[in-house]
């Protein structure tokens, strides 16, 4: 007993955990220790604590128990026992001893025990193991200077080649610091790293488990049980080796420096020992090491490739593919995966554990949160559960207040009611002191602050305490626009709904109420947000009626390449919301690759077939729309860049389209449709609208189109093939239910135009007609204009743009305006009248008073139309509904603009769009017009572009800047051909931040 008391301190320092555990087990088998005593001793995490507890228990039991302990020590560690009783004949540490130790360490660093680790921490109950051989990805590090700024990016190899001691590896939680140090040890053990070849010994030390001295720590963590040297001799030998010894010290942020001053000295007074040191630490403790660090390297973010490599190496193929797909479809996930810990947690959630299903962002953060609190409980075990819970609540309030104040940096004042040690020790908060007078605190990830805030808001909204509920609702009421809902507070609301069904119900109700009173139309953004909100809430069908208010009479866009779990669950669990949607847009895209030539297909049919197969409509799109029993109001399907379409595609398309009551079909740049459109139209009998763009049609296609007598809309765009006799134009008369007809940039001649005119005679229900960018049709427009005048009395929108409109055709239209009284939009721009233009425009203007509802008037240009300006303007002034007006290519001069200005200053207050482009005025004319802009307060668009290059006077620019700055709604101003210098542009951008083109 006296021997133990006399050598108590040395026993505590030198025994080590391994020997202490073996002695404890031995004494239990000899019935000296009870089961309870053994469990109490072994529960100690730190080696010295375990040894101290063992000695205290034995000393209380008396002399016989002490004798048994010494006997056990003699059996387990005879060298230490002989040292203790003074019988050991000391021998020096030989070169052979060091060689044997080096061999032992190299074997240790190659053992599974060292290479395999639990990425979620040894203190968790989750049995997931990673292997460094498979999971390590080459990290990037930032070299930092004295001012704590990133100076240069380094690979691990480059850092080792430039190594200076002590080297500090800095990084936030989960950034892979431990992995880097272990990798260095493994590289040394492999003897394949040139930068590490000169090191005779490499010691990897976990500072959290450090003993009361450096030698004791090495003995406890690394030495073989057969070592036969004493502390003084060994350390002297190590110090003589100098820079040839590398210490890898992991986790300075968890190091109790007062318990092991030797290691603290080794780091901070490194020149005294002359050994090489690499130490890792978290950001909040970097301030303790910056002064002594010769090289400070900060761990960089994971690249997307790093994340993908880790996922592929860790998971089984099916599990990896699922997570990789989720990573591809979510920019949010890509951002999170920059932090290795998030990749690890995402992998853990995919590993088939029943408690870990990777469904939502909330799941990821909730798992991380629980792990951090559970893993670091040992650091705060001295605090009661009530104190911990209170600080966690205040921590949530801090996050919530910060979000609504747009604050992500906090100071000591903000943490005045919180125990700082709780949050720092758990790892929920990071502390930054480098190059700062006052410490700054941040959540270790911005999105993590949003999660903590959402978690807290969810607790408030679902609380049984009315004061908490009121507090939560007060936060919700601060969100007053759809824009804020879908941008600034998007993640906050997602995490709120991901944490509670009750909170979800209240959030959905609030969002619907905000949208109801928001004057701006953000319907598309709101639907996308609602989709994410539903998925995050994991409520399935429970709140289907609540969600219906978010989707009613709105539009949902889906791209076939980005069909996600959100869409699948939405279709599966919320069919009532699908039916409530006014429109669903489905974009089916083929490949953009060049279609193989016939010769290539003959030479390599397999390759060609593979290329073609890439164009197939994906099965997941079919399953999404076909596997349910509700009905969509309107479905708009776009086939884009399909270079091949086979029977399977047509069948799939039919299955998709049959789910809707009404179908819109858009075909763009799809050569594979040519000749196959017949089959498509046969399988999609509910087509109401058909739009064909840059896709050639066969005669069979055209004939099938004109048989679709129930069709409401037909648009043919950018078709440069010759007109096929007996096709579309000849059969147009069959489409008697047509309400909208568009021909844009198609190839037709004079005779084709007359055929088109004959077809228009039958379209008595037509409400919108657009013929644009068509040339070489001679006087064919006269026939078309006559047909419009005779039969299209229901027209609301008439656009005849750049289509060879003649004065005669214009006069025909003008004379019939009394029968076209429903027209709201009349666009005749892009046409240039050569003869009798003045008279025809005058006649048109005189009859505009018959158009009670006209809002848009784009007049044609011409050689002499400017001479009717004074006759036209009084008529236009008498049209109160006019909001858009164009005098493009009117050859207006300074005098003409002055005339225009004299009329526009009164009676045109509702004008929002004014196009005066391609005219001939100079500064004086533009000055007169600029002066009256103040009388047009509703202007949103102005075009003052000139036909020729124009250098404005400085006074014009100054007054124009003043004028546009006073127009609150103006967002676009075109000044093409104005020669503006940098000073001019700077002033214009300062006034409205608009770009000169």
From Swiss-Prot:
Tell me which InterPro entries the record gives. Answer: CARD, DEATH-like_dom_sf, Leu-rich_rpt_Cys-con_subtyp, LRR_dom_sf, NACHT_NTPase, NLRC4, Nlrc4-like_WHD, NLRC4_HD
Tell me which residues make up the CARD domain. 1-88
Major localization listed first in the record, in broad terms? cytoplasm
Task: Give a GO cellular-component term.
Answer: cytosol
Does Repeat count among this protein's keywords? yes
Q: Which keywords accompany this UniProt record?
A: Apoptosis, ATP-binding, Cytoplasm, Immunity, Inflammatory response, Innate immunity, Leucine-rich repeat, Nucleotide-binding, Repeat
Annotated LRR repeat ranges: 550-570, 629-652, 708-731, 735-758, 760-785, 797-820, 821-843, 851-875, 884-905, 908-935, 937-958, 972-994
- The source's domain of life comes to Eukaryota
Q: From its record, what is one biological process in GO terms?
A: regulation of apoptotic process
Q: Where in the cell is it found?
A: Cytoplasm, Cytosol
Purpose: Key component of inflammasomes that indirectly senses specific proteins from pathogenic bacteria and fungi and responds by assembling an inflammasome complex that promotes caspase-1 activation, cytokine production and macrophage pyroptosis.
What is this protein identified as? NLR family CARD domain-containing protein 4
Gene name tied to this protein? nlrc4
């Amino acid at each position: 007993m006296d021997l133990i008391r006399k050598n108590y301190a040395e026993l505590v320092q030198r025994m080590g955990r391994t020997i202490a555990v073996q002695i404890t087990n031995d004494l239990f088998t000899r019935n000296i220790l009870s089961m309870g005593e053994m469990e109490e001793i072994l529960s100690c995490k730190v080696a010295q604590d375990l040894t101290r507890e063992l000695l205290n228990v034995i000393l209380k039991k008396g002399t016989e128990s002490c004798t048994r302990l010494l006997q056990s020590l003699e059996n387990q560690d005879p060298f230490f026992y002989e040292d203790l009783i003074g019988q050991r004949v000391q021998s020096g540490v030989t070169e052979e001893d060091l060689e044997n130790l080096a061999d032992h360490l190299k074997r240790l660093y190659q053992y599974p025990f060292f290479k395999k680790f639990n990425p979620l921490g040894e203190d968790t109950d989750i049995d997931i193991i990673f292997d460094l051989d498979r999971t390590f990805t080459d990290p990037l590090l930032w070299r930092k200077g004295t001012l704590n700024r990133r100076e240069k990016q380094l690979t691990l190899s480059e850092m080792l080649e430039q190594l200076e001691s002590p080297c500090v590896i800095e990084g936030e939680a989960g950034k892979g610091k431990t992995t880097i140090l272990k990798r260095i040890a493994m590289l040394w053990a492999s003897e394949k790293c040139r930068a590490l070849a000169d090191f005779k010994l490499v010691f990897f030390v976990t500072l959290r488990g450090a003993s009361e001295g450096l030698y004791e720590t090495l003995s406890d963590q690394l030495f073989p049980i057969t070592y036969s040297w004493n502390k003084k001799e060994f350390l002297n030998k190590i110090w003589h080796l100098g820079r040839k010894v590398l210490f890898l010290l992991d986790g300075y942020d968890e190091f109790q420096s007062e318990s092991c001053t030797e290691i603290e000295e080794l780091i901070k007074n490194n020149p005294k020992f002359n050994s090489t040191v690499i130490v890792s630490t978290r950001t909040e403790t970097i301030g303790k090491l910056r002064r002594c660090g010769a090289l400070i390297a900060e761990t960089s973010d994971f690249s997307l490739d790093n994340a993908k490599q880790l996922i592929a190496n860790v998971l089984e193929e099916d599990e990896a593919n699922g997570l990789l797909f989720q990573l591809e479809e979510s920019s949010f996930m890509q951002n999170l995966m920059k932090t290795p810990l998030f990749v690890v947690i995402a992998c853990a959630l995919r590993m088939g554990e029943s408690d870990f299903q990777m469904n939502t962002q909330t799941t990821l953060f909730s798992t991380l949160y629980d792990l951090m609190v559970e893993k670091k409980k040992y650091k705060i075990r001295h605090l009661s559960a009530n104190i911990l819970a209170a600080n966690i609540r205040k921590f949530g309030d801090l996050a919530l207040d910060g979000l609504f104040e747009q604050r992500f940096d906090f100071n000591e004042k903000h943490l005045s009611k919180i125990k700082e040690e709780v949050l720092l020790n758990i790892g929920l908060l990071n502390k930054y002191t480098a190059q700062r007078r006052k410490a700054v605190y941040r959540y270790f990830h911005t999105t993590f602050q949003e999660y903590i805030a959402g978690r807290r808001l969810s607790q408030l909204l679902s609380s049984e305490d009315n004061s908490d509920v009121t507090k939560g609702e007060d936060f919700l009421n601060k969100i007053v626009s759809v824009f804020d809902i879908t941008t600034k507070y998007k993640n906050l609301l997602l995490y709120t709904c991901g944490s509670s069904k009750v909170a979800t119900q209240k959030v959905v109700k609030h969002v619907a109420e905000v949208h109801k009173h928001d004057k701006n139309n953000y319907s598309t953004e709101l639907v996308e947000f609602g989709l994410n909100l539903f998925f995050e809430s994991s409520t399935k069908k429970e709140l289907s009626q609540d969600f219906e208010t978010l989707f009613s009479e709105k539009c949902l866009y889906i791209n076939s390449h980005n069909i996600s779990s959100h869409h699948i669950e939405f279709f599966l669990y919320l069919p009532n919301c699908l039916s409530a949607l006014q429109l669903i847009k489905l974009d089916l895209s083929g490949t953009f690759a060049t279609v193989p030539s016939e010769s290539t297909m003959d030479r390599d049919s397999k390759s060609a077939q593979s290329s073609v197969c890439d164009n197939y409509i994906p099965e997941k799109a079919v399953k999404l729309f076909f596997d349910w029993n509700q009905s969509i109001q309107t479905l708009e399907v776009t086939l884009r860049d399909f270079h091949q379409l086979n029977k399977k595609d047509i069948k799939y398309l039919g299955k998709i389209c049959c789910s809707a009551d009404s179908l819109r079909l858009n075909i763009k740049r799809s050569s594979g449709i040519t000749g196959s459109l017949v089959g498509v139209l046969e399988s999609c009998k509910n087509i109401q609208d058909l739009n064909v763009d840059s896709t050639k049609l066969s005669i069979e296609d055209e004939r099938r189109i004109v048989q679709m007598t129930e069709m409401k809309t037909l648009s043919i765009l950018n078709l440069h093939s010759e007109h096929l006799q007996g096709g579309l134009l000849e059969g147009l008369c069959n489409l008697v239910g047509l309400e909208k007809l568009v021909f844009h940039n198609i190839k037709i001649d004079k005779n084709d135009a007359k055929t088109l005119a004959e077809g228009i005679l039958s379209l008595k229900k037509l409400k919108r007609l657009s013929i644009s960018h068509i040339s070489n049709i001679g006087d064919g427009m006269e026939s078309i204009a006559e047909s419009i005048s005779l039969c299209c009395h229901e027209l609301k929108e008439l656009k005849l743009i750049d289509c060879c409109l003649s004065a005669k055709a214009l006069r025909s239209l003008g004379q019939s305006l009394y029968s076209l009284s429903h027209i709201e939009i009349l666009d005749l721009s892009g046409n240039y009248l050569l003869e009798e233009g003045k008279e025809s425009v005058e006649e048109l203007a005189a009859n505009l008073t018959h158009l009670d509802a006209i809002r848009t008037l784009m007049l044609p240009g011409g050689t002499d139309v400017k001479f009717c300006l004074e006759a036209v303007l009084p008529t236009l002034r008498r049209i109160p509904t006019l909001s858009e007006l164009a005098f493009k290519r009117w050859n207006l001069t300074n005098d003409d603009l002055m005339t225009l200005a004299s009329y526009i200053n009164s009676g045109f207050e509702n004008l929002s769009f004014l196009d005066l482009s391609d005219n001939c005025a100079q500064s004086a004319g533009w000055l007169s017009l600029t002066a009256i802009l103040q009388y047009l307060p509703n202007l949103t668009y102005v075009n003052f572009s000139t036909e020729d290059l124009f250098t404005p006077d400085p006074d014009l620019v100054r007054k124009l800047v003043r004028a546009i700055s006073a127009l609150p709604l103006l967002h676009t101003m075109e000044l093409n051909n104005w020669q503006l210098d940098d000073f001019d542009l700077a002033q214009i951008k300062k006034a409205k931040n608009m770009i000169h083109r």
